[in-house]
A protein has these predicted regions:
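Long intrinsically disordered, low-complexity regulatory regions enriched in proline and serine/threonine
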Residues: 180, 191-199
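N-terminal segment immediately downstream of the Sec signal-peptide cleavage site
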Residues: 1-43, 173-177, 184, 188, ...
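Predominantly extracellular/secreted and cell-surface proteins with exposed
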Residues: 3-141
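Intrinsically disordered, low-complexity regulatory segments enriched
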Residues: 56, 60, 159-162, 218
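Intrinsically disordered, low-complexity, compositionally biased regions/tails
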Residues: 49, 61, 166-169, 177, ...
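Extended soluble regions of mature proteins
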Residues: 116-174, 180-185
């Protein structure tokens, strides 16, 4: 950014609670999910409540990511590398979309850019036998590993005031079907404040997909008040 060296800003901790459903209308599969991502202090590993912007010096409320509904239409054809023992499938998503916050003056210091441009790359790595073994159990999901790499714009809560630059995120993870195997911080959030996130959505909803920008718009007043994020998510009927 502005000729500066890359800066190590955060570590991350997260969970993606998801399920696939068959959609007869498109004759394909839809991935439905809820997602939590917590920002961690890279030195201590503690969940951040506030963050000091190293360029502006401002201390800001941290808006951890919580998306209660997302959906993704799984392509009919997916890039795959099939090997005798270990195989992988890859998904690459490149987007350039209008920024819904850009024209609102109250967000001018948070997200003034005209477009949101990002590149996301997912890779799932698994034993090749999972493609043909009909005796697999849910416990076998633990053998699936995930790699996720993203280049995208600053998060609105970082209040970068339109300065040039971007975030590079690099995640690794594993698949599990057991709630008890989640990180204690994630479990505590779900048990104490976000019971809606115990399960993935069961069907497609008639609503827009959550993003950092839509959430910032919806929760901006709470952000200014210094409320604790992610905000509570009680169980609710979804239509």
């Amino acid at each position: 950014m502005d000729g500066n060296q890359p800066a190590y800003l955060f570590d991350f901790l997260g969970v993606d609670i998801s399920r696939c459903i068959k959609d007869e209308i498109i004759n394909g599969w839809i991935l439905l999910s809820r997602k939590i991502t917590l920002y961690l202090d890279p030195q201590t590993g503690q969940v951040l409540k506030t963050w000091q912007n190293p360029w502006s010096g401002e201390t800001l409320n941290v808006m951890h990511r919580s998306y209660d509904y997302q959906e993704f239409e799984i392509p009919q054809q997916i890039k795959a590398h099939i090997a005798p023992e270990i195989s992988s499938v890859s998904l690459d998503i490149n987007l350039k979309l209008p920024n819904p916050l850009a024209k609102n003056p109250k967000f001018s210091e948070h997200s003034p850019e005209e477009f949101i441009q990002s590149s996301d790359s997912y890779k799932f790595i698994f034993p090749t036998k999972m493609l043909s073994d009909e005796t697999l159990t849910p416990a076998d999901n633990r053998a699936v590993a995930l790699s996720y790499y993203r280049m995208g714009p600053w998060e609105p809560w970082m209040k970068m005031k339109g300065k040039p630059g971007f975030l590079v995120l690099n995640y690794t993870g594993t698949k599990t079907d057991a709630f008890e195997e989640l990180h204690p911080e994630i479990k505590a959030q779900i048990q104490q404040r976000m019971p809606l996130f115990y399960e993935a959505p069961t069907h497609r909803l008639q609503r827009s997909i959550a993003t950092s920008w839509s959430r910032f718009d919806e929760q901006f007043d709470g952000y200014l008040r210094g409320e604790e994020f992610p905000l509570p998510a009680p169980v609710a009927e979804e239509v």
